[in-house]
């Protein structure tokens, strides 16, 4: 298991959630949940989430990943998920209306995200740059918040810090999906 030095625990993953997913997802995910719980890391960019609280957004926000299990939300409102069938991980980038496949291995995916020594893959696939740019002038969003573009990018918003506000994650994803439709990748 990868060591996460800046993890800020909010709460434990409910036991019923662990039991529900034990036979469905990687032992590494269960180990992560038991060791760390729900909270933030990677300077607040990554949020470990209860999948039960985001499963409805997966169904509403995309046509093709309804069976995927959401594991993390980023500080930019993207959902990192694991597919039930094959264990591959991916990221739904609501801000761009796109999906990117990541890796099959949970530990490698986490390492890809938090390795500050070799961040090229993270920059290419997770794209956290604007989050860290915003932190230079804005306070980090709370656990249930993220930075969102106002107006949203697909409606002409500009990808600049000046157009980023702190928004509620769920409401922001719902707004993007309501205004522009589900991700069709």
Q: Residue locations for each model-derived region?
A:
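Compact, glycine/acidic-enriched structural inserts
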Residues: 90-126
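A surface-exposed partner-binding patch
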Residues: 1-91, 96, 141, 145-185
